[in-house]
Amino acid sequence: MDSASLVQFASALHKHQDSIAGSNTFVMYTVPADAFLQMTEVKMHEELADAGVLTEFDESLGKAMFVSHQWLSATHPDPDFQQLKVLQDTLRNIVAGTSSISQALFSEIVYGRRRGPAPGDFASGHLHIWYDYFSIPQSHGGRASRGRQTAIQSIPTYVARCEFFVVLCPALKHKDQKRTLSHASWGERGWCRTERAARELSTRKGGYVIVVESATHQSLLWGGLSMRDAPGEGEFTLDGDRVWIGRMVTQMVWSKLFYYLEHRQFHNYRFLLNAHAALYFRALDLEPIDGLVPGFHTEIDPSVDCKGFMLERFLHHNGLRNIFERDAAGWPPICFAAMSNNVVVLQALLDRKVDINQATTKPATELTLPAKLTALGIASILRNKEAVELLLRARAQVNYKDGFGGNALHTACGGDNPRGVRLLCDARANVNQQS
Protein backbone atom coordinates (compact mmCIF):
# COMPACT_ATOMS: atom_id res chain seq x y z
CA MET A 1 0.00 0.00 0.00
CA ASP A 2 0.98 3.63 -0.47
CA SER A 3 2.10 5.67 2.52
CA ALA A 4 -0.34 8.05 4.19
CA SER A 5 1.92 11.04 3.51
CA LEU A 6 1.90 10.38 -0.25
CA VAL A 7 -1.88 9.93 -0.39
CA GLN A 8 -2.46 13.05 1.70
CA PHE A 9 -0.15 15.14 -0.48
CA ALA A 10 -1.85 13.94 -3.66
CA SER A 11 -5.26 14.75 -2.19
CA ALA A 12 -4.14 18.23 -1.17
CA LEU A 13 -2.83 19.19 -4.60
CA HIS A 14 -4.96 21.67 -6.46
CA LYS A 15 -5.47 21.13 -10.15
CA HIS A 16 -1.91 21.57 -11.38
CA GLN A 17 -1.64 23.57 -14.55
CA ASP A 18 1.13 22.44 -16.88
CA SER A 19 4.14 24.48 -15.78
CA ILE A 20 5.49 24.62 -19.32
CA ALA A 21 2.37 26.33 -20.60
CA GLY A 22 1.05 29.73 -19.76
CA SER A 23 1.11 33.37 -20.76
CA ASN A 24 4.63 33.08 -22.17
CA THR A 25 3.66 30.40 -24.67
CA PHE A 26 4.04 31.47 -28.30
CA VAL A 27 0.98 31.02 -30.52
CA MET A 28 0.72 27.53 -32.00
CA TYR A 29 0.73 28.18 -35.74
CA THR A 30 -0.12 25.30 -38.06
CA VAL A 31 -0.74 24.75 -41.76
CA PRO A 32 -4.04 23.08 -42.71
CA ALA A 33 -3.39 19.75 -44.41
CA ASP A 34 -5.34 20.88 -47.49
CA ALA A 35 -2.85 23.72 -48.00
CA PHE A 36 0.12 21.53 -47.09
CA LEU A 37 -0.76 18.91 -49.71
CA GLN A 38 -0.71 21.59 -52.42
CA MET A 39 2.81 22.80 -51.58
CA THR A 40 5.69 22.31 -54.01
CA GLU A 41 8.35 24.18 -52.02
CA VAL A 42 9.12 24.92 -48.39
CA LYS A 43 8.38 28.53 -47.47
CA MET A 44 9.29 30.02 -44.11
CA HIS A 45 6.94 31.23 -41.40
CA GLU A 46 6.86 34.88 -42.45
CA GLU A 47 6.02 34.09 -46.08
CA LEU A 48 3.20 31.75 -45.08
CA ALA A 49 1.85 34.29 -42.59
CA ASP A 50 1.80 37.03 -45.25
CA ALA A 51 0.00 34.68 -47.65
CA GLY A 52 -2.65 33.86 -45.04
CA VAL A 53 -1.79 30.17 -45.01
CA LEU A 54 -1.08 29.84 -41.28
CA THR A 55 -3.82 29.22 -38.73
CA GLU A 56 -3.77 29.60 -34.96
CA PHE A 57 -4.48 26.04 -33.96
CA ASP A 58 -7.44 25.27 -31.76
CA GLU A 59 -8.67 21.79 -30.91
CA SER A 60 -12.08 22.67 -32.32
CA LEU A 61 -10.45 22.78 -35.77
CA GLY A 62 -9.51 19.09 -35.67
CA LYS A 63 -6.29 17.22 -34.94
CA ALA A 64 -2.72 18.45 -35.08
CA MET A 65 0.43 16.68 -36.25
CA PHE A 66 3.86 17.61 -34.87
CA VAL A 67 6.63 16.89 -37.40
CA SER A 68 10.05 16.12 -35.91
CA HIS A 69 12.86 16.01 -38.47
CA GLN A 70 16.46 16.85 -39.33
CA TRP A 71 17.33 19.71 -41.63
CA LEU A 72 18.73 18.67 -45.01
CA SER A 73 21.10 21.65 -45.23
CA ALA A 74 22.77 24.11 -42.90
CA THR A 75 20.47 26.99 -43.86
CA HIS A 76 17.24 25.37 -45.06
CA PRO A 77 15.27 22.38 -43.78
CA ASP A 78 14.37 20.91 -47.16
CA PRO A 79 15.90 22.87 -50.06
CA ASP A 80 14.70 20.49 -52.78
CA PHE A 81 11.34 19.62 -51.19
CA GLN A 82 12.32 15.97 -50.80
CA GLN A 83 11.47 15.38 -47.16
CA LEU A 84 8.05 17.02 -47.15
CA LYS A 85 7.16 15.36 -50.46
CA VAL A 86 7.51 12.04 -48.63
CA LEU A 87 5.10 13.26 -45.94
CA GLN A 88 2.61 14.45 -48.55
CA ASP A 89 2.68 11.08 -50.32
CA THR A 90 2.45 9.28 -46.98
CA LEU A 91 -0.74 11.11 -46.01
CA ARG A 92 -2.28 10.47 -49.42
CA ASN A 93 -1.35 6.77 -49.30
CA ILE A 94 -2.71 6.23 -45.79
CA VAL A 95 -6.03 7.89 -46.60
CA ALA A 96 -6.27 5.91 -49.86
CA GLY A 97 -5.50 2.64 -48.07
CA THR A 98 -2.40 1.89 -50.16
CA SER A 99 -0.17 2.18 -47.09
CA SER A 100 -0.77 1.37 -43.43
CA ILE A 101 1.08 2.04 -40.19
CA SER A 102 2.66 -1.09 -38.76
CA GLN A 103 3.43 -1.78 -35.12
CA ALA A 104 7.01 -1.96 -33.88
CA LEU A 105 8.04 -5.58 -34.45
CA PHE A 106 9.43 -6.26 -30.98
CA SER A 107 6.40 -4.96 -29.10
CA GLU A 108 4.02 -6.83 -31.42
CA ILE A 109 5.88 -10.11 -30.82
CA VAL A 110 5.86 -9.63 -27.04
CA TYR A 111 2.51 -7.95 -26.39
CA GLY A 112 0.47 -8.68 -29.51
CA ARG A 113 -1.12 -6.34 -32.01
CA ARG A 114 -2.53 -3.08 -30.75
CA ARG A 115 -4.91 -0.62 -32.30
CA GLY A 116 -3.29 1.98 -34.52
CA PRO A 117 -4.67 5.14 -36.11
CA ALA A 118 -7.39 4.73 -38.72
CA PRO A 119 -7.02 6.12 -42.27
CA GLY A 120 -9.83 8.56 -41.58
CA ASP A 121 -7.77 10.15 -38.81
CA PHE A 122 -5.56 11.66 -41.52
CA ALA A 123 -8.33 13.17 -43.63
CA SER A 124 -7.06 16.54 -44.79
CA GLY A 125 -10.21 18.45 -43.87
CA HIS A 126 -9.50 18.37 -40.14
CA LEU A 127 -5.72 17.78 -39.95
CA HIS A 128 -3.22 20.56 -39.19
CA ILE A 129 0.56 20.38 -39.55
CA TRP A 130 3.09 21.84 -37.09
CA TYR A 131 6.54 22.08 -38.73
CA ASP A 132 9.32 24.25 -37.33
CA TYR A 133 10.05 26.26 -40.48
CA PHE A 134 6.33 26.96 -40.93
CA SER A 135 5.40 27.53 -37.31
CA ILE A 136 8.36 29.36 -35.73
CA PRO A 137 9.53 32.85 -36.81
CA GLN A 138 12.63 32.58 -39.00
CA SER A 139 13.67 36.17 -39.82
CA HIS A 140 16.52 37.95 -38.05
CA GLY A 141 14.75 41.02 -36.66
CA GLY A 142 14.60 41.62 -32.92
CA ARG A 143 10.87 40.89 -32.64
CA ALA A 144 11.18 37.70 -34.68
CA SER A 145 14.17 36.60 -32.62
CA ARG A 146 12.22 37.03 -29.37
CA GLY A 147 9.26 35.20 -30.86
CA ARG A 148 11.54 32.40 -32.03
CA GLN A 149 13.00 31.93 -28.54
CA THR A 150 9.54 31.83 -26.97
CA ALA A 151 8.29 29.42 -29.62
CA ILE A 152 11.22 27.06 -29.05
CA GLN A 153 10.51 27.10 -25.31
CA SER A 154 6.87 26.33 -26.16
CA ILE A 155 7.69 23.13 -28.07
CA PRO A 156 6.61 20.84 -25.18
CA THR A 157 3.22 22.58 -25.18
CA TYR A 158 2.86 22.14 -28.94
CA VAL A 159 3.76 18.46 -28.69
CA ALA A 160 1.18 17.94 -25.94
CA ARG A 161 -1.55 19.45 -28.11
CA CYS A 162 -0.82 17.19 -31.10
CA GLU A 163 -2.63 13.90 -31.64
CA PHE A 164 0.17 12.73 -33.92
CA PHE A 165 3.92 13.00 -33.36
CA VAL A 166 5.63 12.16 -36.65
CA VAL A 167 9.30 11.29 -36.98
CA LEU A 168 9.95 12.27 -40.60
CA CYS A 169 13.18 10.47 -41.46
CA PRO A 170 13.38 9.19 -45.05
CA ALA A 171 16.87 8.25 -46.21
CA LEU A 172 18.05 11.47 -47.90
CA LYS A 173 21.46 13.05 -48.37
CA HIS A 174 22.38 16.19 -46.42
CA LYS A 175 23.30 18.90 -48.90
CA ASP A 176 26.36 20.17 -47.03
CA GLN A 177 27.56 17.20 -44.99
CA LYS A 178 27.21 14.74 -47.90
CA ARG A 179 25.95 12.02 -45.57
CA THR A 180 22.65 10.21 -45.63
CA LEU A 181 20.17 11.14 -42.92
CA SER A 182 17.83 8.45 -41.62
CA HIS A 183 15.90 7.27 -38.58
CA ALA A 184 19.22 6.40 -36.95
CA SER A 185 20.69 9.87 -37.47
CA TRP A 186 17.43 11.46 -36.26
CA GLY A 187 17.85 9.54 -33.00
CA GLU A 188 21.36 10.92 -32.55
CA ARG A 189 20.29 14.58 -32.58
CA GLY A 190 19.86 16.23 -29.19
CA TRP A 191 16.92 18.39 -30.26
CA CYS A 192 15.13 15.42 -31.83
CA ARG A 193 15.61 13.46 -28.62
CA THR A 194 14.20 16.39 -26.67
CA GLU A 195 11.11 16.50 -28.87
CA ARG A 196 10.66 12.76 -28.32
CA ALA A 197 11.04 13.31 -24.56
CA ALA A 198 8.41 16.05 -24.74
CA ARG A 199 6.01 13.50 -26.17
CA GLU A 200 6.82 10.93 -23.49
CA LEU A 201 6.46 13.49 -20.71
CA SER A 202 3.36 15.23 -22.02
CA THR A 203 0.15 14.87 -20.05
CA ARG A 204 -1.84 14.12 -23.19
CA LYS A 205 -3.92 10.97 -23.13
CA GLY A 206 -3.75 8.87 -26.27
CA GLY A 207 -2.22 9.84 -29.57
CA TYR A 208 0.39 8.15 -31.72
CA VAL A 209 4.11 8.41 -32.40
CA ILE A 210 4.70 7.46 -36.03
CA VAL A 211 8.00 6.90 -37.81
CA VAL A 212 7.83 7.78 -41.53
CA GLU A 213 10.77 6.28 -43.43
CA SER A 214 9.16 6.39 -46.87
CA ALA A 215 5.78 7.02 -48.46
CA THR A 216 4.98 3.32 -48.06
CA HIS A 217 6.85 2.48 -44.84
CA GLN A 218 5.44 3.84 -41.59
CA SER A 219 5.52 2.30 -38.12
CA LEU A 220 4.71 3.14 -34.52
CA LEU A 221 7.80 4.11 -32.53
CA TRP A 222 9.20 1.47 -30.18
CA GLY A 223 9.07 2.73 -26.59
CA GLY A 224 12.34 1.05 -25.63
CA LEU A 225 14.35 3.79 -27.34
CA SER A 226 13.69 6.15 -24.45
CA MET A 227 15.66 3.86 -22.14
CA ARG A 228 18.92 4.66 -23.91
CA ASP A 229 18.59 7.96 -25.79
CA ALA A 230 18.87 10.74 -23.19
CA PRO A 231 18.54 14.23 -24.77
CA GLY A 232 21.81 15.51 -23.27
CA GLU A 233 23.78 12.65 -24.84
CA GLY A 234 22.62 13.63 -28.31
CA GLU A 235 24.52 15.72 -30.85
CA PHE A 236 24.16 19.51 -30.86
CA THR A 237 25.34 21.99 -33.47
CA LEU A 238 25.65 24.56 -30.67
CA ASP A 239 26.79 23.18 -27.34
CA GLY A 240 25.05 26.08 -25.59
CA ASP A 241 21.73 24.52 -26.58
CA ARG A 242 22.20 22.09 -23.70
CA VAL A 243 21.25 24.92 -21.33
CA TRP A 244 17.95 25.40 -23.19
CA ILE A 245 17.37 21.67 -23.22
CA GLY A 246 18.06 21.40 -19.49
CA ARG A 247 15.46 24.03 -18.64
CA MET A 248 12.85 22.44 -20.89
CA VAL A 249 13.42 18.91 -19.66
CA THR A 250 13.36 19.97 -16.01
CA GLN A 251 9.99 21.68 -16.50
CA MET A 252 8.62 18.65 -18.32
CA VAL A 253 9.68 16.21 -15.60
CA TRP A 254 8.26 18.38 -12.80
CA SER A 255 4.99 18.73 -14.68
CA LYS A 256 4.66 14.99 -15.28
CA LEU A 257 5.48 14.13 -11.66
CA PHE A 258 2.72 16.44 -10.43
CA TYR A 259 0.35 15.02 -13.05
CA TYR A 260 0.94 11.50 -11.78
CA LEU A 261 0.35 12.57 -8.19
CA GLU A 262 -2.85 14.44 -9.04
CA HIS A 263 -4.22 11.40 -10.84
CA ARG A 264 -3.01 9.01 -8.12
CA GLN A 265 -0.81 7.11 -10.56
CA PHE A 266 1.63 6.40 -7.77
CA HIS A 267 3.66 3.68 -9.48
CA ASN A 268 4.23 5.91 -12.50
CA TYR A 269 5.25 8.70 -10.13
CA ARG A 270 7.82 6.44 -8.45
CA PHE A 271 9.09 5.20 -11.81
CA LEU A 272 9.71 8.72 -13.13
CA LEU A 273 11.01 10.07 -9.81
CA ASN A 274 13.71 7.40 -9.77
CA ALA A 275 14.41 7.03 -13.50
CA HIS A 276 14.40 10.64 -14.70
CA ALA A 277 18.08 11.24 -13.94
CA ALA A 278 19.09 8.38 -16.24
CA LEU A 279 16.41 8.85 -18.88
CA TYR A 280 16.30 12.63 -19.20
CA PHE A 281 18.97 14.43 -17.11
CA ARG A 282 22.07 12.46 -18.08
CA ALA A 283 24.83 14.61 -19.65
CA LEU A 284 22.98 17.80 -18.68
CA ASP A 285 24.18 20.04 -15.86
CA LEU A 286 21.16 19.27 -13.68
CA GLU A 287 20.63 18.04 -10.15
CA PRO A 288 18.17 15.13 -9.91
CA ILE A 289 14.79 15.76 -8.33
CA ASP A 290 14.92 13.63 -5.20
CA GLY A 291 11.48 14.23 -3.77
CA LEU A 292 8.26 16.22 -3.77
CA VAL A 293 6.36 14.98 -0.73
CA PRO A 294 6.48 17.42 2.22
CA GLY A 295 6.42 16.55 5.90
CA PHE A 296 9.45 14.29 6.19
CA HIS A 297 10.62 13.67 9.74
CA THR A 298 12.55 10.89 11.40
CA GLU A 299 14.17 10.23 14.74
CA ILE A 300 17.33 8.99 13.01
CA ASP A 301 20.28 11.34 13.42
CA PRO A 302 22.06 11.63 10.04
CA SER A 303 25.37 12.30 11.79
CA VAL A 304 25.04 8.93 13.55
CA ASP A 305 23.35 6.81 10.86
CA CYS A 306 23.61 8.53 7.48
CA LYS A 307 22.48 5.48 5.50
CA GLY A 308 19.48 4.91 7.75
CA PHE A 309 18.48 8.57 7.47
CA MET A 310 18.74 8.50 3.65
CA LEU A 311 16.72 5.28 3.54
CA GLU A 312 13.91 6.82 5.58
CA ARG A 313 13.94 9.88 3.33
CA PHE A 314 13.83 7.67 0.23
CA LEU A 315 10.83 5.73 1.55
CA HIS A 316 9.02 8.97 2.43
CA HIS A 317 9.40 10.62 -0.97
CA ASN A 318 8.50 7.39 -2.77
CA GLY A 319 5.42 6.90 -0.62
CA LEU A 320 6.56 3.43 0.49
CA ARG A 321 5.57 2.23 3.95
CA ASN A 322 8.50 -0.12 4.60
CA ILE A 323 11.53 -1.71 2.97
CA PHE A 324 9.88 -5.03 2.10
CA GLU A 325 6.44 -4.13 0.74
CA ARG A 326 5.89 -3.92 -3.02
CA ASP A 327 3.79 -1.21 -4.60
CA ALA A 328 0.56 -1.95 -6.48
CA ALA A 329 2.50 -2.61 -9.71
CA GLY A 330 4.64 -5.29 -8.06
CA TRP A 331 7.85 -3.29 -7.68
CA PRO A 332 9.86 -3.57 -4.43
CA PRO A 333 11.84 -0.64 -2.94
CA ILE A 334 15.21 -2.15 -3.92
CA CYS A 335 14.28 -1.92 -7.61
CA PHE A 336 13.42 1.77 -7.32
CA ALA A 337 16.70 2.40 -5.48
CA ALA A 338 18.64 0.68 -8.28
CA MET A 339 16.72 2.73 -10.82
CA SER A 340 17.84 5.99 -9.17
CA ASN A 341 21.46 4.79 -8.83
CA ASN A 342 21.19 5.60 -5.13
CA VAL A 343 23.99 3.45 -3.75
CA VAL A 344 23.57 4.78 -0.20
CA VAL A 345 19.97 3.59 -0.09
CA LEU A 346 20.88 0.34 -1.84
CA GLN A 347 23.52 -0.41 0.76
CA ALA A 348 21.11 0.48 3.57
CA LEU A 349 18.58 -1.98 2.15
CA LEU A 350 21.20 -4.72 1.86
CA ASP A 351 22.38 -4.03 5.42
CA ARG A 352 18.81 -4.68 6.54
CA LYS A 353 18.75 -8.07 4.78
CA VAL A 354 16.47 -7.12 1.89
CA ASP A 355 16.62 -9.85 -0.77
CA ILE A 356 19.09 -8.60 -3.38
CA ASN A 357 17.36 -10.71 -6.05
CA GLN A 358 13.84 -9.51 -5.26
CA ALA A 359 12.19 -8.94 -8.65
CA THR A 360 9.26 -7.07 -10.11
CA THR A 361 6.08 -9.08 -10.66
CA LYS A 362 4.50 -7.10 -13.51
CA PRO A 363 5.86 -5.78 -16.82
CA ALA A 364 6.14 -2.12 -17.81
CA THR A 365 4.58 -2.55 -21.23
CA GLU A 366 4.86 1.11 -22.26
CA LEU A 367 8.66 0.79 -22.11
CA THR A 368 8.77 -2.85 -23.21
CA LEU A 369 10.22 -3.95 -19.86
CA PRO A 370 9.44 -7.52 -18.77
CA ALA A 371 8.29 -8.75 -15.40
CA LYS A 372 10.78 -10.47 -13.07
CA LEU A 373 13.39 -7.72 -13.36
CA THR A 374 15.82 -7.59 -10.47
CA ALA A 375 17.63 -4.53 -9.18
CA LEU A 376 20.69 -5.65 -11.15
CA GLY A 377 18.71 -5.89 -14.38
CA ILE A 378 17.18 -2.46 -13.86
CA ALA A 379 20.51 -0.81 -13.04
CA SER A 380 22.03 -2.48 -16.12
CA ILE A 381 19.46 -1.20 -18.60
CA LEU A 382 19.70 2.34 -17.20
CA ARG A 383 23.53 2.32 -17.28
CA ASN A 384 23.73 3.00 -13.56
CA LYS A 385 27.33 1.87 -13.21
CA GLU A 386 27.72 2.49 -9.47
CA ALA A 387 24.58 0.51 -8.65
CA VAL A 388 25.69 -2.37 -10.89
CA GLU A 389 29.10 -2.50 -9.21
CA LEU A 390 27.57 -2.47 -5.72
CA LEU A 391 25.06 -5.19 -6.53
CA LEU A 392 27.72 -7.40 -8.10
CA ARG A 393 29.98 -6.97 -5.06
CA ALA A 394 27.02 -8.00 -2.91
CA ARG A 395 26.65 -11.20 -4.98
CA ALA A 396 23.51 -10.40 -6.93
CA GLN A 397 22.50 -13.31 -9.14
CA VAL A 398 23.74 -12.39 -12.62
CA ASN A 399 21.77 -15.06 -14.47
CA TYR A 400 18.37 -14.48 -12.84
CA LYS A 401 15.78 -15.04 -15.60
CA ASP A 402 13.44 -12.15 -16.31
CA GLY A 403 10.02 -12.40 -17.93
CA PHE A 404 11.56 -12.58 -21.39
CA GLY A 405 13.88 -15.39 -20.32
CA GLY A 406 16.97 -13.18 -20.42
CA ASN A 407 19.36 -12.07 -17.71
CA ALA A 408 21.00 -8.77 -16.73
CA LEU A 409 23.35 -9.13 -19.71
CA HIS A 410 20.35 -8.91 -22.03
CA THR A 411 19.07 -5.76 -20.34
CA ALA A 412 22.53 -4.19 -20.45
CA CYS A 413 22.63 -4.81 -24.20
CA GLY A 414 19.11 -3.42 -24.56
CA GLY A 415 20.25 -0.28 -22.75
CA ASP A 416 23.35 0.12 -24.96
CA ASN A 417 25.52 -0.32 -21.88
CA PRO A 418 29.00 -1.62 -22.85
CA ARG A 419 30.43 -0.94 -19.39
CA GLY A 420 27.65 -2.96 -17.84
CA VAL A 421 28.24 -5.80 -20.30
CA ARG A 422 31.91 -5.87 -19.33
CA LEU A 423 31.12 -5.90 -15.61
CA LEU A 424 28.53 -8.65 -16.01
CA CYS A 425 30.81 -10.80 -18.16
CA ASP A 426 33.55 -10.43 -15.53
CA ALA A 427 30.96 -11.63 -13.01
CA ARG A 428 30.35 -14.71 -15.20
CA ALA A 429 27.02 -13.81 -16.69
CA ASN A 430 25.88 -16.52 -19.09
CA VAL A 431 26.40 -15.14 -22.58
CA ASN A 432 24.63 -18.18 -24.04
CA GLN A 433 21.43 -17.84 -22.01
CA GLN A 434 18.53 -17.82 -24.45
CA SER A 435 15.36 -15.83 -23.96
Description of each model-found segment:
Residues 324-333, 359-375, 401-407, 434-435:
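Ankyrin-repeat boundary/"N-cap" motif
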Residues 357, 370, 377-381, 390-394, ...:
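Extended amphipathic alpha-helical coiled-coil/heptad-repeat regions
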Residues 1-344, 348-349, 358, 378:
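The feature represents the membrane-entry module of six-transmembrane cation channels
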Residues 314-322, 347-355, 362, 389-397, ...:
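Ankyrin repeat domain, specifically the short helix-to-loop turn at the C-terminus of the second helix
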Residues 152, 418-421:
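A general structural signal for well-ordered alpha-helical packing
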